[in-house]
Amino acid sequence: MVKLGCSFSGKPGKDPGDQDGAAMDSVPLISPLDISQLQPPLPDQVVIKTQTEYQLSSPDQQNFPDLEGQRLNCSHPEEGRRLPTARMIAFAMALLGCVLIMYKAIWYDQFTCPDGFLLRHKICTPLTLEMYYTEMDPERHRSILAAIGAYPLSRKHGTETPAAWGDGYRAAKEERKGPTQAGAAAAATEPPGKPSAKAEKEAARKAAGSAAPPPAQ
């Protein structure tokens, strides 16, 4: 062990009394330590770096967003609350529009037909007719409805309301056909050997014309 106040400059062969003067000039190897040197005094003020005071480097600024700018933009809490409310209103209006379109496409056209009728292929069809054709042959019913839908409306109205001159023409034609049909029936009932009354009248008329006297000169 090293003793206090000893130096390596001394030699073991010399007297310790002669070494006292040399020991006074030499520096001791180990000196007593002060307790105040072991623990430094605590500072009165502690500086803490915050986010605003801390400066990020260029690569760090690209990774992290500008939080301070976002805070300045949303400084008012009311504006931040208005954004979700506006989105909810827009979503509700879009949903309401979709519901109205579905209502128009599915149920609204059905109300245009009167009671007891059903809308099929944009035509009001009676429910009894619908049930009848459905029980018989559904495919035939569909083809009939398709043909009715393809038929022009002008032709439909023409067949439903015939003109007055058509009725008069049919009546005159039936009157002309009536006497000829009656004569043919009478000729069929008479015997083949007996001449008809019409033939007798024509023969008498010819005989009277030939027997008439010539006019006086």
From Swiss-Prot:
GO cellular component terms, alphabetically, are:
cytoplasmic vesicle; cytoplasmic vesicle membrane; endosome; glutamatergic synapse; membrane; plasma membrane; postsynaptic endocytic zone
**Subcellular location field:** Cytoplasmic vesicle membrane; Cell membrane
**One example GO MF annotation:** clathrin light chain binding
The answer, when asked if Transmembrane helix is one of the entry's keywords, is yes
The known PTMs are summarized as: Glycosylated.
Matching InterPro entries, A to Z?
NSG
Keyword Cell membrane present in the record's keywords: the answer is yes
Topological domains on the Cytoplasmic side lie at 109-217
Which stretches face the Extracellular side? Answer: 1-87
Q: Which superkingdom?
A: Eukaryota
Q: What is its main location?
A: membrane
Write out the ranges of the annotated region (Disordered). Answer: 1-25, 162-217
Its Gene Ontology biological processes?
A: clathrin coat assembly; endosomal transport; positive regulation of endocytosis; postsynaptic neurotransmitter receptor internalization
Coiled coil, from the record: none
Q: Which residues are glycosylated?
A: 73
Where are the membrane-spanning stretches? 88-108
Going by the UniProt record, its keywords in alphabetical order are: Cell membrane, Cytoplasmic vesicle, Endocytosis, Glycoprotein, Membrane, Transmembrane, Transmembrane helix
Q: In which tissues is it expressed?
A: Expressed in the pyramidal cells of the prefrontal cortex, in hypothalamus and in caudate nucleus. No expression in spleen. Up-regulated in the prefrontal cortex of schizophrenic patients with nearly twice the levels of non-schizophrenics.
Q: How does it sit in the membrane?
A: Single-pass membrane protein
* Pfam families, A to Z: Calcyon
Q: Which family does it belong to?
A: Belongs to the NSG family.
State its role: Interacts with clathrin light chain A and stimulates clathrin self-assembly and clathrin-mediated endocytosis.
**Self-association or partners: how does it assemble?**
Interacts with CLTA.
Q: What is this protein called?
A: Neuron-specific vesicular protein calcyon
The organism is Homo sapiens (Human)
